[in-house]
């Protein structure tokens, strides 16, 4: 286990007067045991944002690790997400309550619609349920995940409420430049998941060369690039040493030519499902 906790990540302002750490850890794909160990390690190291989802099946494990940490609830930022099966006004509100029960928490800091699943046509109703959940104190902030510019605009136009966050696939191969601009116009924070492109850039010559110049790992360079774009970022790991390394990205800054070089890797490669056609989880 790494030693002293690293400094907590800086925070970014949300459009609802709340704040969120710009960097945190997600637990997608981890078993209960892996989740409990990873979250415990992350919290001990200094991470304060933990991202889970109903569809991950590990909310209870996240809750156990949080409870065991002894860290005051107010110091943590916990995100979870509503599954597509629970789209709908009443269903999404009830799903939030069920997530709280599994987490063992009185509230979450951010509740997201996991996927728009546009063919089902219920994501706007689901967001209405999130508005209700926020009003009842189940969540501090509400947002969306995997939403396109069209989906975000529909939610705003039909509910008159702007999501605080849009969490999307975003990495140098898919830098989401247009979507980031659209989010910013709505004052929606863009939060990147898969910032490491599922390992596909670990040996990329551009990335490794830049990492060598700064004495950093390719992972640190990829996270730093994302943060310098102005995004919030969620990384995934079950390894305590990797978690510590991933959190240690606030003591250096990439020069503009290196940012440009990484931007040049963008070729539109999508590693996760297409939000326009995916039926969701």
From Swiss-Prot:
Enzyme class at the top of the EC tree: oxidoreductase
E.C. number: 1.1.1.-
Active-site positions on this chain: 56 (proton donor)
CDD domains in the cross-refs: AKR_AKR5H1
Keyword 4Fe-4S applies: no
Keyword Electron transport: no
Pfam families, alphabetized: Aldo_ket_red (PF00248)
GO MF terms held by the record: aldo-keto reductase (NADPH) activity
Residues noted as binding NADPH in the record, renumbered to the chain: 196, 234, 237, 245-246, 272
InterPro entries: AKR (IPR020471), Aldo/ket_reductase_CS (IPR018170), NADP_OxRdtase_dom (IPR023210), NADP_OxRdtase_dom_sf (IPR036812)
Keywords: NADP, Oxidoreductase
Record family assignment: Belongs to the aldo/keto reductase family.
Protein name: Aldo-keto reductase MMAR_1744
């Amino acid at each position: 286990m790494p030693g002293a906790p690293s400094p907590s990540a800086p925070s970014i302002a949300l459009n609802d007067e709340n704040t969120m750490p710009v960097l945190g850890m997600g637990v997608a794909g981890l078993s209960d045991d892996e989740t409990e160990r990873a979250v415990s390690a992350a919290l001990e190291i200094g991470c304060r944002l933990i991202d889970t989802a109903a569809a991950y099946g590990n909310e209870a494990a996240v809750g156990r690790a949080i409870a065991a940490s002894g860290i005051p609830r107010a110091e943590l930022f916990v995100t979870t997400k509503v599954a597509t099966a629970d789209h709908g006004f009443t269903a999404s509100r009830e799903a939030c309550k069920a997530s709280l029960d599994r987490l063992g928490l009185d509230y979450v800091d951010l509740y997201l619609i996991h996927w728009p699943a546009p063919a089902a046509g219920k994501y706007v109703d689901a967001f209405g349920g999130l508005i209700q959940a926020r009003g009842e104190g189940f969540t501090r902030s509400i947002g969306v995940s995997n939403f396109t510019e069209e989906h975000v605009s529909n939610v705003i136009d039909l509910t008159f409420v702007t999501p605080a966050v849009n969490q999307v696939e975003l990495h140098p191969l898919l830098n989401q430049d247009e979507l980031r601009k659209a989010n910013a116009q709505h004052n929606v924070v863009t939060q990147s998941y898969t910032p490491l492109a599922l390992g596909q850039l670990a040996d990329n010559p551009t990335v490794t060369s830049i990492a060598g110049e700064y004495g950093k790992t390719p992972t640190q360079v990829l996270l730093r690039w994302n943060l310098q774009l102005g995004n919030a970022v969620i990384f995934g790991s079950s390894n305590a040493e990797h978690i510590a390394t991933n959190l240690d990205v606030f003591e250096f800054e990439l020069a503009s030519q290196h940012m440009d070089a990484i931007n040049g890797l963008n070729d539109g490669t999508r590693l996760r499902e297409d939000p326009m056609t995916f039926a969701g989880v």
